[in-house]
Amino acid sequence: MFCHLRPLRRFGLRKVLPHWLHYSRALSGAEAINALRPFYFAVHPDFFGQHPREREVNENSLKRLSVYLENLQKPGFKSLKPTQLTFYIREKTAQNSSEGQEPISTTGFRAVRFTLHSSDLLSTVLYILNSCSLPVEHVQSLNTNVHSQPLKEATGMPDRPIKWHRSYYSFTGFKDPDEDLTHVSRVETTLTSWLGSNGKGAVKKLRNSLPLRKELDRLKNELSELLQLSDIRWQRGWGVAHRCSQLHSLSRLAQQNPGPLQNVKGCTVVFTDRSGMSALGHVMLGTMDVHHHWTRLFESLPSYFDLQRRMSALEAQISNLLGGIQVVYIEELQPALTLDQYYSLLHTFYNQLLRSRVPPHPHPQSLSGLQMILSSDRYAPSLHELGHFDIPALSDPASLQSFMRTKAQQARENMTRREKLKVMENELIQASTKQFSLEKLYKEPSISSRQMVDCCKRLLEQSLPYLHGMHLCVSHFYSVMQDGDLCIPWNWKKGEAMK
């Protein structure tokens, strides 16, 4: 049941994982962000203004961490490749270096390296905090089903944290971390104060990035026209300079070896971590791969197109067996799968239906207009609040049909609400963009339509002159990106932050 904790033992963390972890409910995304606040405070790029190299390392690592946490929260998530991260941690008092950590430098920070490999959100949060030698007591308070011994007994920690007298900080010249946390709680979690403190810096970064942004648009348009592409996208939050570099690389390949690239006509190209074709049929170009790998991919596209046709036929056969319901892949809610992986999942489910000899649905089109997604987990089928059915590939077909018939009307109602919510979201994005004269307003994939609607409604009640001409991203935390984009949490606070 708890096999996902085994990798932690190799790192000597078995003793420091709280005993109550084994009796806890799943941690929500919002609770995970809240639990990681001490970590975000220790690594936030804004505190590394005098150290551009360390700042960039933290910015890039935070992006990769955000992607990892987002994938952990997707329904049907099974596993991720181990992700190695490096962060520079702000230090105020001397500590002994431990495994995976470098000694503290004279500049007031130390480097910490760790590898994420857990498929559980709670154990991932605890692993991050422990790797950075940060407290974990507050995580226990987030869990409502704790029925075991207190944290101090499970971890062997002292009864209370060490609290130094003010004279210690006066004598040593170090800052009291409690005062820093209090200041950040008041300023960073208040939208107007945070914008006031960071607006000018963001404007400067945005202005500096404008030439590269124009170059990016030019390259994207030229390549789209040259290769007759449907679109060019990026799966990660790379900066403008990195995106330009990737497009230049593709442009050079198109000039040096144009033949294989004729196969990409009409496709969407996505720059990501690995090369191949996605479950949606997008051509994925791994940014760490060389031109030789890209060329082989372009040459093999005809075989991928054939697999796409077989996949569509398989989806149609499944639909016919299950009353006309549409089998879909929703990128925002499912783990990132290649076309091969998704076809294998469909094939497993189809064989499950055939082996059970389930008779055709008594009303062939009774579920027409409804949608279902397939997952690789072993949980029971469920109906998502957005209206689609989340179906494990190894579900019992007989009980599955009964479940779908019972929930069909509720699914249609959920889908109707989803469509109305999407329309409202688009209207509020347009209204907010116009009211604040934003150059761009967008959200991270992990932000739901409901969260975006709530955020925009509250924004429209504010007077925010700092946003004029800016790029605003609705996310889970505050940050100024390297090219000047402002990230704010969807549930931002106004006035005094809640303690």
Curated annotation (Swiss-Prot):
Signal peptide: none annotated. The keyword Hydrolase does not apply. Keywords: Coiled coil, Mitochondrion. Residues 206-233 form a coiled coil. It is found in: Mitochondrion. InterPro entries: DUF4460 (IPR028031), DUF4461 (IPR027989), TCAIM (IPR027986). It holds the Pfam family DUF4461. One of its GO terms (cellular component) is mitochondrion. It comes from the Eukaryota. Expressed in peripheral blood leukocytes, mainly in T-lymphocytes. Induction: Up-regulated during induction and maintenance of graft acceptance and down-regulated during graft rejection. May regulate T-cell apoptosis. This is T-cell activation inhibitor, mitochondrial. It comes from Mus musculus (Mouse).
